[in-house]
Amino acid sequence: QHWSDYFKPG
């Protein structure tokens, strides 16, 4: 997973 997945999962 990427750090952005925690802010905008998808």
From Swiss-Prot:
Keyword match Secreted: yes
Modified residues annotated as Glycine amide in this record: 10
Gene Ontology CC entries for this record: extracellular region
Modified residues annotated as Pyrrolidone carboxylic acid in this record: 1
UniProt entry keywords in alphabetical sequence: Amidation, Hormone, Pyrrolidone carboxylic acid, Secreted
Subcellular location: Secreted
Tissue specificity as recorded in UniProt: GNRH neurons lie within blood sinuses close to the gonoducts and gonads in both juveniles and adults, implying that the neuropeptide is released into the bloodstream.
Role played: Stimulates the secretion of gonadotropins; it stimulates the secretion of both luteinizing and follicle-stimulating hormones.
Family: Belongs to the GnRH family.
Coiled coil ranges: none
InterPro entries in alphabetical order: GnRH
GO molecular function: hormone activity
Protein name: Gonadoliberin-1
